[in-house]
Every structure is written in C-alpha cells, then in structure tokens.
C-alpha cells in the first residue's frame, strides 16, 4: 500500500532510520524513540495476525517486512542493563519481570496482553493505554533513559519488546509482520512508554489510557496507513522527535539519516505511516469507534483471560483491585491516579492467575501460549509492556507513595526482600528453582544472562542486522522459540515475582497509607470507606478482613466482632482498628499479607484508621513497615490501632527498620503539624503522652479486655494527668476527656506520635481509644454518649463515658449558664492545665485538626487565656488559632472567663464535637483531626460514616445531642463530600486528598458546629435554637457540612486557605467563639480565617466580652449588627465566602447567649461570612443582616427574635435563645443577610422568599441566602441544607425551608422581611405547598441550575450571591438531593420540640439518602455535583464536597 511519506521531522529521519535500523529499537529499552515509530515486533502477533494481517496488509505494505523492517532485529530480551536498571531502579515489579531474556521469555500469554485478535484500533487503544500508563515511568527509569537515549541501542541486551514481538510473530498462527508495521507497532510500544504515554496522554488524555493499561504490543499499524499517516503526520513529529536509536539495520546504520530514510524510506515511510497510523489510532482513540473497540478489546482482553482462566476474576477478587475498581468507579480522580495501580493489579493478578496458567500451559512456550493464547496472543514479552508495567509499578508506587521512588526503592528493597521471601515462599510454584532469586537476583541474573541463547540470538539478530532478514527471521524465530521457552520460565518466575510484587504492592499500598500521613491515610481510608460504604456500617475492618485473607478474616472477625458489634460503623471501625487492630493486628497483618491487608490495613488501618488518625500515629510508625513489607503487612499495616501496640510494636519495629524510607513516602505531619504536635505534645505529652506511649508499647497481643484495662489504667493515668488538666471539669474531672485523650493521643501520636516509637504511648492511646470507643459503644444512648460524654472522656470507656453522660445529663438539666459556667470552668481548667493538641498531618489537616483540636485543645487543654497566650502555641500550631488567640489575645483572655462560658459550652461543644468527631465529626476522625495522630480511632469511623454510609453512619455515629429541652438531636455527620475536591495532598489519590480528610477535619471543625449540635448539648437551653443550631447542628453537621461544605467552603476557605488550619481553627473557634476566637483568630473566632478576620475585625465581637456580656440583646444585637455589618463588609472584603463557611461553623455559637450572639455575630458574621459569599455578593448584607435577624432560632422554645431588620436587635427573650437565634439569626442573619440582600433584592428574595418561607422571610431568605450563600455555607444549614438545597434553591429551600421551618418554625413566623414567597412554616411543613410556593423559586433555581449556579435568577441577592449560589448551589445541590426527603424526614425524625432536625436533615443530607431525589428534583444538584469538585478547589470546595 502506498504510504504517505511521513513528515520528516529533524528527528524523523533518524527516527525512522533508527526504527528501521534498530531491531533493538523494538525494545523499549533500546529504541525508545525508535520504538515509537518503527518497532515492528511490538504488536501482538495474534492480534496482528488475524486483524493486523488485514491492517498490516492495509497499513503495512507487507507483513513479511518483518525481515525487511530492521525492527525485526529483536533483542532476545530487553537489555540486561534495562532489566538490571529496572531492578536497580527498585522497579521491583519490573525487575521481577525484567529478566531481560526471561522477561521476553515469559509467555506473553502469561504476561497479560491483549487478546490475540485485537483490532488494530484495539491494539492501538491498548498501546495508548499502555503508553498512557507508560508515562508513569520516572525519568530515572532505565526505560525512560533508554527511551530518551539513542545509545540505548548500544546497550548489551536487546529490548525485550522487539524479541517479544517477533517472538509472538513466531508464535503459531502468529505472523511475524516483517513490515515496518510491525516495526512501527513495536517501536511505539517499545518507545519508552513514558514518552509514548506522555505524548499520547498529551494527545489523548482519554481516561482509557489512565484507566486500563493495555499491553502495548498491539499493532498500531492496524489503522489504515493513510489515516495513520495523516494522523501520524500530525503526531509523528513528537514521536519522531524522540529519535529512536538507530539500530543496526540491514540498511547500513552508517547511512545518513537521509540515506537511511531513502534506503529505508519505504520501510520508514511505512513505519512513519504506521507511526502515523499508530498516532492516528491514538488520535482516533478519542473517537468512539476506537474507544468502543478498545472497550471491546478490554473485554476481550480481560475476558479471554477469565475465559481462559477463571482466575482472572481472582485479581478482581483481589481486595486491592476490588478496592481500586470501586474507588475507580467512585472516585474518577482516584481511579485515574490509581488506574495505573489498578491495571498493574489487573496485570499482576492476572499474571498471578496466569502463573497457574503458565503452570498449566507450562513450559511448552507454543502450547502454553496457544492454550493461553486464546486470551492473549499479544506477546507479553513485549518490552513495552514490561516498561509499562515498570512504569505502572512506579506510577502505582509513586501515586500510592507520594514519594514513590525513594519509598519505592525502599519498599522495593523490602519487596525484593519480601519478594525473595514471598517468592521464596511463593516459589512453591516450582518456577522458583530459578525464581528463588528472580525477584531480586533471579530476574536480574536472568536478565543478566547474555549467555542465554535468546540473548545470543538477539545479539546475533542485532549484530546480524546486516545479515539477510531471512536469516534474521530464522534467528529471530529461533530466538523466539528460545524466548518462548525462557519466557515461559521467566514468565512463571515473573508471575511469581509479579504475584509477590503484587502482594508487595498491595502490602505497600496497605503500608503506604500507613506511611502516608494521616491525611493520605484518611484519604485512603476514605477510599476504603468509599468503596465499602455499604460495608462501613459493619466496619471497614470487618470488610477488609472479610475481603482480606481468611487468616486476617479470622482474626479480624474476632477483633471486629469484639468491638465491631456495637462499635460497628462509628467506633467499630476505630475499635476494629483498636480491637480489630489489636485482635486484627495479626489479622491486619494477615490482611496486610492479603490484599485485604491493604483493605484491612487501609480499611482497618485506614478505614478503621480513620484511625488514620490512629494510623498516623502508627503512620509515623507504620511507614517504616514499608521496608518490612511482610512485617509491615503483618505488623505495620494494622497501623496500630492507636494504641494497638500489637501492630504498633511491629510497625515500630518496621519503623525502626525503615522509618527513613517511609519518611519520603509518608506524608508525615508537616513540620507545622509536628510543631503543633510538639506544641500540643508539650502539654499533652506532659499529660498522657509518655504514659500513653509507654503503655502502648508491647500490646501486641493485647486483648480487648486487656486494652480496656490498659485504657482504664491509661485513663486513670491520664485522669491523673488530665484530671489536673481538667481538674475544673464538672463531671469530667479526674477522668481524661476525649479532648484529653486527643491531647494525649495527639501528643503521643501527632506526626505519627511524638513518641511514635514509644509504643506505650500508642498503647495507652490505643487503650484510650478503645475505651473511648467502648464508651461510645457502651453509651447506648447516643444522646448522652454522643452529646458530650464520649468526646469529653475518651479513655475510661463506659465509665468516663457514663460520667460524661451524666455530666451531659446534668448539663442538660442544668441551666445554660450553669452548663456554661461548668464548661467554662472545665474549659478554663482544661485550657489552663491541658495542652492544646492540634494535629494535622498536612497543613490543611493541621488547620482543620488544629481548628478542631484547637477547639478541644484550647477548650480542653488550654484556657482561652492560654488560647490567647497558650494558644500562641495553638497559634503557632494553628495559624488561625494564633490569629484568634493573638488578635483576641487581650480580649480573649479578658473574655476568657466569658469564653470559658462559651468555651465551657465549647468544652461541651468540644466534647460534643469530639463525640461528633468520634461519631462522625471527621473522616480524618474528629480525633484524628483533633489529635491528628489517628490514635483516636474513634474518629475514623465517623469519617468512614461520612464517606461511606452517610445515613447508616450518621444513624449509628451521629452523636445524639441531648438538647437542653431534652430533645435528642443527631448531630449529622458530615461526610467529606469534598472528597472529590482536590486536597493539598495530591500524594494521595485526589479524592483521598486532604480535602476529604479536611472535609472530615472541617467536620471536626464543624464538630465545633457540632459544637453547635454540641451546642445543642450545651445549648440544651438553646436547644431548638441549637437545633436551629442543629440547623446549626445541621450547621454543626452542616457546619460539618459547612466544614465539609466549608471544607468545600473550607475548601473555599481552602481557597482562602487550603490551610484548613485557619479554617479548622476558625471552625474550632467558631464554637470557641467567640470574641476570643474571633478576636483571637479569624478562623478561631468565626470559623473562617479571613471570615473570622472580618468577623474578628467586625466581630472581634467588638470585645470578646461583648459576646459574653449578658447584654446579649444589646451587645449581641448591636454587636451583631455591628459585627454583621462590619463583618459582612469585612467578610466581603475578607473573601469570606469560604471563611464565611467557617464562620458559619462559628454558628456553633457558644450556647452562652452572648457568646452565641457573639458567635451569632460571629455566626452572623460567620454566616455573613458564610453569606460573605452572599455578603461578598450581597454587600447589602449588613443591612440585610440586620433585617434577617428577624429569624427566630427556635420556633417553640425561643420567641422569634425579631431583630430589627436594620438593627438585628434581638427583640426576643433569652439571651441564650437570642444568641442562639442570633446564631440562628447568624445563620439566618447571614442568611438573612443574604436574604436581606435577597430581601433587598426581593426579586431573588422571591426565590429566597420561598427560602424565606421556611425561615422568616428574612430567615428564610437568610436560609435561602444562606442556602444560596450557605449553599456554600452549609452553616445556615438548617438553611444550610436549604442552602445546599439552595442550589435547589427553591425546592430544596422549600424542603429545606420546610426543614428549617420545621426546625425554624419560628423562622416561618417572621415571614416579613420582604419574603414575597415567604410562608411561615409551622413545625409541620407543607412540602407540596412549599414546592408550590417554591415553584417560582424552584423555577428560578432550576433556571439557575440550568444556567449555572451563578445564573442570576435563582438567587437575586446579587452577583456575589450568585457566586455563592454557584458555590453554594453546587454544595447545596450536592446535598440537596437528600434535603428534599430530609425535610419530611426531619418532620418526623426531627419532631423534637426544636425542629432542629435540619442538622439531622443535613445529616440525612450528609447521608445523601435523598440526595439523589434532590438531584432528581433539582437539575442544578447534579450540575452542582458535577461542578462541586471543580468548585471545591475554586471556592475551597463546595460545601458538601
């Protein structure tokens, strides 16, 4: 066929020449560039044979050009240097495969390859996929070097791919295409896959490349030459620019490139055409045809294997593959990032299965290949695939390990050792006579065997490149025969090596999370949870164990069943981490040995180690496990239950073995976080750190009872320490609080534990965690246990939990002031005596964790004065805390006593939050964010709950906040919806990125808003308001959402600061409130940093005292007005959208009315800040805020606070109620601000007015605006759910408004404020009527949804409101689906006196049970979801994301 002469780039000639000339170029190692263009060998002989004969005949003038094409000069094996380099590169997997000869000798069939009859496009697709994965090759990889170096030809060993191709060609029924087509196929596949992938990925970023690595030995020439020429002309240059090393060709390599091209131009043209065809295939990759074929290919590619061997499913059953597939499905980003991991898993697992296939197909290369060739005719020997696999290994390792190479090498060394062990162990396959050393040496030795007849043949082919092609073909066929034999041997060996490698990789993957910092672990845990959401309720550990090896299963079953039964989902995961990690440490070790070890370690360690917090402790320890892969899997992968010294010791051992390796790979706590940890640990280590570390040491076989005893003892010890710390605790004195536990845990476990090696510290921490989980677990009433107690008292278990429950009950019984006083005292005592434990594995986690931990720590450990001053540690630890305590320093310490009220509330909040964190406050684990060490395994279940089964998790773990009215409110766990929103840590898979954990952390922070819900505990007086704070609880959980959303908004704030610290700190001090936090820290005060700063500026709470001032109405109103107006303006100035979200968290509002008002101002301001999107958008918000304060927080208990629309003066009753209203008003205020803005712009207020329907027109608008704004700010999340639904502004608003109206029945009362559509809703909400009312708003919303969140109509608060809508709608939409049903759900479930269910509603939203419904009802919801991840980064992430 006449091929278009490919455009000759400068490199094109040489490229073609070298491709033509270099048979070696066929190997990726030699002709990296040549491989791109010319290698004929590469394409699967079978695939080439049947389809490619056509395509070859079409695209390539003659199949027999195998002899004519210099690419037929196949190195018998990939260059030994490459193999050795690969081995040397620590590309263990590759090295396992790269017995250069052995690798080629490995049956390509055993080497996973495309089905024999792949269409050229399929082959191209596979190549593209492979090339896409090939891009993973590190520049250091020998292949990349070879690929880039022309001297690669000179390397002693010929590229594997070339011999593989001819070998395949030589295979029965395989026609060795002599045409440069083969050459073209091979060179491209042989081309350093990284280059190919880079080029292809650049050209074709299709997910297929990333998604499914397909063997590259596909004939790229399958596409018609002219098409390929056309496309390749476009794409040939990049390939040609990578000059393939000119290999000795029959045509003299001495010829000038022009001469060579002229002499070889037919071949080169063919090759170029083929390359062009390849590229055209690549170009056509984007085409549905190609992709469809590719998909068919893949199905064929996989199915033949599964058909050939049912074991193909085995890798599918492989927990890692399974996990990654699930994660891949659920997390496209992660799938992309992990796709390489998935594909090597496929490959490895298939290889593993193929190993047995090899055994069955056996030494007969032809017969084995034939028998197996049904599934695979493509030569797995194709070097490009080896390189690809190497690259995939690198890629997987690099992606799995942020520091893939160093860790990869370390882990490869460990894996090589482990592979030697495993291979020696696994060398039972009988392949291992050679395989004993294959992993480390055997392959290298094998590949190093230039003496092998294959290499001799290859060399002869190389050197004989001038010899007649027939001779070359004969030699090549002989070489292929030898290679087939060797490949069968090597392939078996490599299968073992790969199997072992796969296990190693799985172990590493398991270990990697351990090595990974807590964020990454949390992300991995999130992935685990994400994949096993349905399983999560039982416990990821159980799941992981079940999915893990039977041994892991057995042990995990024991451990899981122990705590798993009641601790299931929430504590169970943590307890599974603790107990299961204790019991399952071996099981986790077993699981570590198993793929489930990855899952169990990831699940138990990561899921349970949402105890990633626990794992972080182990993390520092476990990362060492990476080198001791087996030990790590057996030991470290359990990633210490946070005091599960079994694994902890082992991880420590492995840690001792290779902490250095882990360090580059592990996302260790940032130095800031370490500093925080150190700062925290300075205090917390004093308390419990050493004891915890000491106790945790040798708890390898710690039984649950033993752990409980140890925990009790450690709790007693910590009570001794923490008792002094919390000596002023009302009911918690003498028993370490959860904060104490966090502080001690953080102290011991921050950054892997300050005393990471102090296993006793882990032990005690684990014990505390176990006891805490037990306490949670034992606290049958979610009310008392979830409300304050579990969080407050972690270690004593049920005792301290009961104490806290009693304390909570007392608090609920006590007046708000008494509670506040007690909590103030406790907080003061805690803050004075206990160190603040701020932990963050990453800056964001630090911020988030610091935020939350700062809450707890500042609340629990340090007095606000110490927060003011001591928080300087916190300040240094949590930057926003610094701002909070520093800026609030004077005022904060001045208002410290007031803040202690608030902080006492905050202690309750903190306890509540801790409980929330434990219960689901933070995917990272509220404790994790709090301790950051993962030591507090209790937190990990909540992350699991959030990430996995929102509803089930919420149901199980959402702390039931005992409202002061005695009503129970589930604090909705906020799932890290922002998971997809990228996080600062991209080392972890994107959806695993800190935003997920940070979202969890913001959930922690929003556990400050679960301080709001906790404030529901604290504000049991303010219960309905707190329920409106449960709207704030929803805001708490919605603030969790706001933290999640505010993680999204914190992501927004993360935009402001992916420094979750400030946001977290802000959220922490959202509850922390108050003036202190506000004045002290932007983030601390109002929950968002800039937001807080504006709050701080506007709120400063004027004086922290003003918040605390009994003149709540006066100060709060004036202050709120001032703060709101100022804050709104400031927050407008502050980029407070995301900060506003955090400020929404401030909505936690110390239940101290003043504090609440302060918080309300902060909350208002923070809501204004939350609404600052709206506020930023709605500059009228000050005015509007004043209006919207009309919103009454509590319909029943609290009179509607008719704050002057202009003055926000709380006309109503209790300062607390007012403050709660104010906080509610803050929610509604900021919402009202938005609504006022909307009210001011009543056109959108009509939409908002429907939103206003729910709340007062103002509050509804506020909610709607907050819905609009708090779409970004779930903070308004009674409105926030509405806000989230305010993406579905009207419908969700109505729903949410209904919910909010349910919760905010009173808000319905203040229907004035220009809510056109305002309709006061009593506790009962008329969804249909709402919907009818909302039809307009809904129409608006839909318009907005249709035209974008920023499309004006939906919210008319203004451009900023739209902006918030764009953010909030996305966020809202992200939640809004559940919001619809949540309304009715809230009606029934949230029938508590305070229709606080909005938080439950939000909780439900978090669960997202109705999310789809809302999505159904609201187009923007999907749209928002589609944009959520995008907006997450933009705005710090949409709220729910």
Swiss-Prot record:
Residues 39-56, 636-645, 729-751, 981-994, 1068-1087 have a biased composition (Polar residues). Residues 703-720, 1362-1373 have a biased composition (Basic and acidic residues). Residues 1-95, 150-204, 224-289, 401-477, 529-661, 680-760, 776-810, 849-899, 980-1118, 1161-1185, 1209-1321, 1348-1402, 1421-1441 are annotated as: Disordered. GO terms for molecular function: structural constituent of nuclear pore. It comes from the Eukaryota. GO terms for cellular component: nuclear pore. Residues 881-892 have a biased composition (Gly residues). Disulfide bonds: none annotated. GO terms for biological process: mRNA export from nucleus. Signal peptide: none annotated. Residues 19-38, 57-91, 153-187, 227-283, 416-445, 555-564, 572-635, 648-661, 680-700, 780-810, 849-880, 995-1067, 1088-1118, 1225-1249, 1257-1291 have a biased composition (Low complexity). This is Putative uncharacterized protein DDB_G0293878. It comes from Dictyostelium discoideum.
């Amino acid at each position: 066929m006449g091929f278009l002469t490919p455009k000759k780039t400068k490199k094109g000639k040489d490229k073609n020449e070298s491709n033509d000339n270099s048979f070696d170029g066929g190997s990726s190692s030699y002709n990296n560039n040549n491989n791109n263009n010319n290698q004929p060998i590469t394409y699967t002989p079978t695939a080439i044979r049947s389809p490619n004969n056509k395509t070859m005949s079409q695209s390539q003038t003659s199949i027999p050009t195998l002899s004519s094409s210099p690419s037929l000069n196949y190195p018998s094996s990939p260059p030994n240097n490459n193999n050795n380099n690969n081995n040397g590169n620590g590309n263990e997997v590759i090295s396992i495969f790269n017995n250069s000869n052995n690798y080629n000798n490995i049956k390509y069939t055993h080497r996973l390859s495309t089905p024999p009859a792949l269409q050229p496009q399929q082959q191209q697709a596979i190549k593209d996929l492979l090339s896409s994965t090939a891009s993973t090759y590190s520049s250091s990889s020998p292949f990349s070097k070879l690929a880039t170096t022309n001297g690669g030809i000179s390397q002693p060993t010929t590229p594997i791919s070339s011999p593989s191709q001819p070998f395949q060609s030589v295979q029965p029924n395989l026609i060795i295409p002599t045409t440069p087509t083969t050459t073209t196929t091979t060179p491209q596949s042989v081309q350093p896959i990284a280059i190919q992938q880079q080029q292809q990925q650049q050209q074709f970023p299709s997910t297929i490349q990333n998604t499914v690595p397909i063997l590259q030995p596909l004939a790229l020439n399958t596409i018609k030459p002219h098409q390929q020429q056309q496309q390749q002309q476009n794409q040939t240059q990049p390939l040609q620019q990578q000059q393939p090393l000119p290999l000795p060709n029959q045509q003299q390599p001495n010829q000038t490139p022009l001469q060579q091209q002229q002499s070889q131009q037919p071949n080169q043209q063919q090759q170029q055409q083929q390359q062009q065809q390849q590229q055209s295939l690549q170009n056509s990759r984007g085409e549905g045809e190609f992709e469809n074929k590719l998909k068919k290919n893949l199905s064929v590619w996989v199915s033949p294997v599964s058909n050939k061997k049912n074991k193909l499913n085995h890798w599918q059953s492989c927990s890692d593959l399974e996990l990654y597939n699930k994660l891949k499905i659920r997390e496209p980003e992660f799938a992309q990032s992990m796709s390489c991991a998935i594909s090597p898993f496929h490959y490895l697992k298939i290889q593993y299965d193929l190993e047995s296939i090899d055994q069955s197909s056996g030494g007969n290369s032809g017969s084995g290949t034939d028998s197996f060739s049904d599934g695979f005719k493509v030569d797995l020997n194709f070097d490009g695939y080896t390189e690809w696999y190497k690259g995939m290994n690198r890629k997987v390792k690099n992606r799995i390990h942020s520091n893939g190479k160093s860790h990869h090498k370390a882990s490869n060394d460990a894996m090589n050792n482990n592979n030697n062990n495993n291979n020696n162990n696994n060398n039972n396959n009988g392949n291992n006579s050679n395989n004993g050393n294959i992993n480390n040496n055997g392959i290298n030795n094998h590949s190093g065997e230039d003496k092998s007849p294959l290499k001799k043949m290859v060399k002869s082919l190389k050197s004989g490149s001038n010899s007649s092609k027939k001779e070359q073909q004969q030699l090549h066929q002989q070489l292929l025969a030898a290679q087939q034999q060797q490949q069968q041997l090597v392939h078996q060996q490599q299968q073992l090596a790969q199997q072992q490698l796969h296990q190693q990789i799985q172990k590493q993957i398991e270990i990697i999370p351990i090595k990974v910092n807590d964020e990454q672990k949390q992300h991995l845990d999130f992935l685990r949870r994400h994949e096993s959401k349905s399983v999560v309720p039982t416990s990821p550990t159980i799941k992981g164990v079940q999915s893990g090896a039977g041994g892991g299963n057995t042990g995990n079953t024991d451990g899981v069943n122990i705590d798993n039964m009641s601790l299931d989902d929430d504590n169970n995961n943590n307890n599974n981490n603790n107990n299961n990690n204790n019991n399952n440490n071996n099981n986790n070790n077993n699981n570590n040995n198993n793929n489930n070890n990855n899952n169990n370690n990831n699940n138990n360690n990561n899921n349970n180690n949402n105890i990633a917090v626990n794992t972080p402790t182990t993390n520092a320890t476990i990362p060492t496990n990476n080198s001791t892969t087996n030990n790590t899997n057996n030991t470290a992968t359990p990633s210490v239950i946070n005091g599960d010294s079994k694994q902890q010791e082992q991880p420590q051992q492995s840690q001792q073995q290779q902490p250095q390796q882990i360090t580059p790979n592990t996302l260790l706590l940032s130095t800031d976080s370490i500093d925080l940890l150190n700062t925290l640990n300075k205090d917390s280590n004093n308390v419990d750190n050493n004891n915890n570390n000491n106790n945790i040491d040798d708890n390898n076989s710690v039984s649950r009872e033993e752990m409980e005893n140890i925990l009790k003892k450690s709790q007693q010890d910590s009570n001794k320490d923490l008792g002094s710390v919390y000596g002023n605790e009302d009911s918690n004195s003498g028993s370490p609080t959860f904060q104490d536990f966090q502080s001690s845990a953080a102290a011991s476990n921050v950054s892997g534990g300050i005393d990471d090696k102090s296993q006793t510290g882990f032990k005690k921490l684990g014990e505390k965690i176990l006891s805490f989980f037990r306490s949670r677990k034992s606290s049958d009433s979610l009310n008392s246990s979830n409300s304050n107690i579990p969080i407050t008292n972690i270690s004593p278990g049920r005792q301290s939990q009961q104490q806290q429950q009693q304390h909570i009950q007392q608090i609920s019984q006590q007046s708000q002031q008494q509670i506040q006083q007690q909590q103030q005292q406790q907080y003061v005592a805690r803050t004075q005596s206990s160190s603040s434990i701020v932990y963050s594995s990453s800056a964001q986690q630090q911020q988030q964790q610091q935020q939350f931990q700062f809450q707890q720590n500042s609340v629990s450990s340090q007095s606000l004065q110490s927060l003011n001053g001591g928080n300087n540690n916190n300040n240094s630890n949590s930057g926003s805390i610094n701002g909070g305590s520093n800026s609030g320093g004077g005022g904060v310490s001045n208002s410290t006593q007031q803040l202690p009220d608030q902080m006492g509330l905050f202690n309750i909040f903190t306890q509540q939050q801790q409980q929330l964190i434990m219960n689901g406050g933070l995917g990272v684990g509220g404790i994790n964010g709090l301790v950051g060490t993962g030591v507090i395994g209790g937190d990990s279940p909540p992350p699991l709950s959030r990430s996995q089964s929102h509803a089930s998790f919420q149901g199980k773990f959402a702390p039931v906040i005992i409202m002061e009215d005695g009503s129970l409110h589930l604090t909705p766990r906020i799932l890290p919806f922002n998971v997809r929103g990228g996080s600062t840590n991209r080392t972890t898979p994107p959806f695993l990125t800190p935003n997920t954990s940070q979202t969890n952390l913001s959930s922690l922070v929003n556990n400050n808003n679960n301080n709001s819900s906790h404030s529901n505990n604290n504000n049991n007086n303010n219960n309905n308001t707190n329920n409106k704070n449960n709207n704030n609880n929803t805001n708490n959980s919605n603030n969790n959402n706001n933290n999640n959303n505010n993680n999204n908004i914190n992501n927004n704030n993360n935009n402001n600061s992916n420094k979750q610290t400030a946001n977290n700190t802000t959220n922490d001090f959202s509850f922390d409130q108050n003036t202190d936090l506000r004045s002290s820290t932007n983030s601390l005060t109002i929950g968002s940093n800039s937001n807080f700063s504006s709050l701080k500026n506007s709120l400063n709470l004027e004086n922290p005292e003003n918040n605390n001032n009994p003149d709540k109405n006066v100060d709060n109103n004036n202050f709120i007005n001032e703060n709101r107006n100022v804050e709104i303006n400031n927050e407008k100035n502050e980029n407070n959208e995301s900060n506003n979200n955090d400020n929404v968290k401030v909505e936690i509002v110390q239940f101290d009315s003043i504090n609440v008002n302060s918080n309300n101002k902060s909350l208002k301001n923070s809501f204004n800040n939350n609404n600052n999107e709206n506020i930023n958008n709605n500059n009228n918000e000050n005015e509007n805020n004043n209006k919207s304060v009309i919103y009454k927080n509590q319909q029943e208990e609290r009179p509607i606070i008719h704050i002057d629309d202009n003055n926000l003066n709380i006309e109503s009753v209790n300062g607390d109620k007012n403050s709660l209203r104010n906080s509610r008003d803050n929610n509604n205020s900021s919402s009202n601000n938005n609504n006022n803005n909307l009210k001011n712009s009543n056109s959108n207020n009509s939409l908002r007015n429907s939103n206003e329907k729910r709340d007062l027109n103002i509050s509804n608008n506020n909610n709607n605006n907050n819905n609009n704004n708090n779409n970004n700010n779930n903070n308004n999340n009674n409105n926030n759910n509405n806000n989230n639904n305010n993406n579905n502004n009207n419908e969700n608003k109505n729903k949410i408004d209904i919910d909010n109206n349910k919760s905010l029945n009173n808000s319905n009362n203040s229907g004035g404020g220009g809510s056109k559509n305002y309709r006061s809703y009593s506790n009962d909400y008329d969804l249909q009527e709402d919907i009818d009312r909302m039809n307009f708003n809904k129409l608006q919303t839909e318009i907005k949804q249709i035209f974008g969140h920023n499309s004006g109509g939906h919210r008319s608060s203004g451009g900023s409101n739209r902006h918030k809508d764009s953010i909030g709608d996305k966020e809202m939409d992200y939640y809004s689906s559940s919001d619809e049903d949540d309304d009715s759900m809230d009606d029934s479930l949230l029938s508590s006196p305070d229709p606080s269910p909005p938080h439950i509603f939000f909780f439900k939203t978090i669960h997202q049970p109705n999310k789809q419904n809302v999505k159904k009802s609201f187009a923007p919801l999907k749209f928002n979801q589609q944009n959520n991840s995008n907006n997450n980064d933009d705005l710090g992430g949409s709220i729910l994301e």
